[in-house]
Amino acid sequence: MSLTTASRVFADHPSVRPATRDRVLAAADDLGYVVNALAQAMMGLGRRTVAFVAAHMIGSTFADMAAGAESVATAEGNLFLLSTTGEDPARERDLMETLREYRPAAVLLAGSTQTGEEFEQRAVAYAEALAAVGARLVLVGHPACPGSKSILSVDYDQVGGVRRAVEHLVTGGHRRIAFLGLIPERTTPAERLRGYELGLQDAGLPVDPSLVIECANDSDGARVAALSLLSRPDRPTALVCLTDGVAVGVYRAARSLGLAIPGDVAIVGFDDAPIVADLTPALTTIRVPFWEVGVHGARVALGLEEYDGHVQLPTELIVRESSP
């Protein structure tokens, strides 16, 4: 029997007769032979890989996106690969080059949160390099690249979510509303800050720069920033937090200052992460469909859904006990 015939058997070629296929597979089993799936994938045969590349896997955000993407990738018979960059552009570039060499079916890039021309140029280069080997790049959890309409992206409505949160607080009687968690040159804070500003403008309220507070995106950094903010004589009566993790820090600060939630200060988070289940009073927050972002991202990347450019999924304001 020729090597060509054996290769056709392992590639599941329709020209091979059933009896021949059975003999080859039986011989392979006796010899303990294992098919080189990577080599098959690189030749466009067998199972291919869908790669999910994230900045990190801390918290539920990227984990939920990855789970959604994996559900689609595996249902379509693909292998699913997960890797992280640590928000290092050099690591990101090296990883994308390695993935290109392995000829994946698709790559989903999540959490590359930088903005600006330099990132868009990188994304275009990634997309072109992957397209040359038959793969598609999709940004997930990232807003549209205005200067590069050819870059596909699947995101969620961050601006609208925060805008609705501010409207909710204004309706509850609040006028001094702070935004806590600004991190420069990142898409997520930039989008959420824009929603905050638009919400104030909708209500005819000025944007007070002294109420836009930068802090680390964790409960410890938020607690320190909130202690200073809430100790002011003219302290805000409500805070919109960049994330639920930031909101946890604000809870700690308010309690240490003897402030009641929401009587003295109302608090709104963002994400509806699992950590909010432990907060008392229950946190008002903006629910994000992270799993669905991953699902749609994978479907677009694999050509199961066709979208022209950018897909944006809705967010939902979940009103609980920490706001009026």
Describe the predicted segments one by one.
Residues 45-167:
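Alpha-helical recognition/docking segments in bacterial nutrient-uptake
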Residues 151-154, 225-324:
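Flexible loop/turn connectors
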